[in-house]
Amino acid sequence: MNIGFDMILAKLPEAYAMFDPLVDVLPVIPLLFLLLAFVWQASVSFR
């Protein structure tokens, strides 16, 4: 089981090379939601 998983993991780089820019952006998305919360609160005057 573990050997098969390692083989899948080894194949990931070439299979998903086109998604590399997407993976680089993914960690930023929660920060965007945090920023959106502040913008929303500012728009409703921090009720």
From Swiss-Prot:
| Top-level taxon in the UniProt lineage | Eukaryota
> Quick one: a GO cellular component term?
chloroplast thylakoid membrane
For this entry, list what GO says about its biological process: photosynthesis
- Nucleotide-binding is among the record's keywords: no
InterPro entries reported in the protein's UniProt record: PSII_PsbK, PSII_PsbK_sf
What SUPFAM superfamilies does the database record attribute to this sequence?
A: Photosystem II reaction center protein K, PsbK
Residues cleaved off as propeptide: 1-10
Question: Which residues lie in coiled coils?
Answer: none
Keywords linked to the UniProt accession: Chloroplast, Membrane, Photosynthesis, Photosystem II, Plastid, Reaction center, Thylakoid, Transmembrane, Transmembrane helix
Entry annotated with the keyword Chloroplast: yes
Give the transmembrane region(s). 22-42
Q: Where in the cell is it found?
A: Plastid, Chloroplast thylakoid membrane
What membrane topology does the annotation report for this chain?
Answer: Single-pass membrane protein
Give the function comment from the record.
One of the components of the core complex of photosystem II (PSII). PSII is a light-driven water:plastoquinone oxidoreductase that uses light energy to abstract electrons from H(2)O, generating O(2) and a proton gradient subsequently used for ATP formation. It consists of a core antenna complex that captures photons, and an electron transfer chain that converts photonic excitation into a charge separation.
Tell me the protein family, please.
Answer: Belongs to the PsbK family.
| Self-association and partners | PSII is composed of 1 copy each of membrane proteins PsbA, PsbB, PsbC, PsbD, PsbE, PsbF, PsbH, PsbI, PsbJ, PsbK, PsbL, PsbM, PsbT, PsbX, PsbY, PsbZ, Psb30/Ycf12, at least 3 peripheral proteins of the oxygen-evolving complex and a large number of cofactors. It forms dimeric complexes.
What protein name does the entry list?
Answer: Photosystem II reaction center protein K
From what organism does this protein derive?
Mesostigma viride (Green alga)
